[in-house]
């Protein structure tokens, strides 16, 4: 995501004036060294910006206020090098509106056994300074992330990097505009939702845009731009004979390229990060956008079919969260089952719109018949997802809260080819089993649409939900239905009392 290059995480080190000027200079020097080395060698996705050491209530509060108003700052990382009395932090933490990470580390990795003295003990007080700060976070009921470990350890780098991605995703969601081309699929329940509450909770700006407005832009795309995009297709994919130059369905591919360019222009110029379509509202379009949606997802846009704006928003968020990580993320639907005894599997797919970021091999580009939508044969990319770990995530509106349901998956290779299936797909074993997973998913009310990701894990999504203040339900190898039912009941009580 290009916009992440402009973002910052501010680093505030806590101390106090109880210490000598010499000690405070050492604190500042250590913080500067850490910042430089983390920026240069830790592979972090966002630049760390060191702020002056916080030694008074006013200094600390000023940084928090500035962080709130900064469009570049997506989060605040704090470290208690020495002891920093937490009452000095109350105003700052009370007003902070950005994600908070406490880095519980110390400058030295090892104790200098033969040299250690009280000067060393006086300077390196993370062990108890961090606990003082932790109390105030708990007292204020703050959602926060704690990373424990030496600042030169790769595990700590990974955790900080993932938190940065989450902070960037939250920053993005606060500004996220979602274009709904057409309304929701008629009579479908789960794709509905409270758009006002979504804007209050997440920042999502969800608005309807007539398909006719999009058609005007699509129809005005220059022929030269379409030809250039067709050349890109030919370089990127294996084209079937039907859509190659001179093929009987080449016109369908030409129209798909026109759609992609027009849709991207509409979304980019309007500042949209996500969009939805619906096959029930295609007036003026020659085909249901398939290839266009696939490629726009790969370029970072969130997408939801049939007007599913919550999944479109979540897809965009997880795309941002997965920046720089291996694996892709796509719109997905649990489509059909393989119920062989001892080998239960789910075939995930959709009519057309599966993101090629999850493709195991070079996709095949084809155009085939699609009865739904009653338009011309649409172009689409065909591929299968690679074997490995994955997660399905579904965001639903429970009326008094949003609930994020996630399921751990094991993607498997196709046991046989599916030459007659004209859509992209992923085949997986849901954990702990199909029986328990499906029952739990249904009991939790999770949608038939989901975000399928092989780049973002459950813990990242848990942190996102914690910061956002939404309910989080996990289905994994440890899930048992009686315990899940109890969790859902207790969650109901908690959200009625506390929210």
Swiss-Prot record:
UniProt-listed Enzyme Commission number(s): 5.3.1.4
Pathway of action: Carbohydrate degradation; L-arabinose degradation via L-ribulose; D-xylulose 5-phosphate from L-arabinose (bacterial route): step 1/3
Any Gene Ontology biological process: L-arabinose catabolic process to xylulose 5-phosphate
InterPro entries membership: Ara_Isoase_C, AraA_central, AraA_N, AraA_N_sf, Fuc/Ara_isomerase_C, Fucose_isomerase_N/cen_sf, Lara_isomerase
Catalytic reaction list: beta-L-arabinopyranose = L-ribulose
A Pfam cross-reference name: Arabinose_Iso_C
Molecular functions (GO terms): L-arabinose isomerase activity; manganese ion binding
UniProt-listed CDD domains: L-arabinose_isomerase
Residues the entry annotates as binding Mn(2+): 306, 333, 350, 449
Keyword entries, A-Z: Arabinose catabolism, Carbohydrate metabolism, Isomerase, Manganese, Metal-binding
Cofactor binding mode and count: Binds 1 Mn(2+) ion per subunit.
Cofactor(s), names only, from the UniProt record: Mn(2+)
Function noted in UniProt: Catalyzes the conversion of L-arabinose to L-ribulose.
Family recorded in the similarity comment: Belongs to the arabinose isomerase family.
Protein name: L-arabinose isomerase
Species annotation: Aeromonas salmonicida (strain A449)
Gene: araA
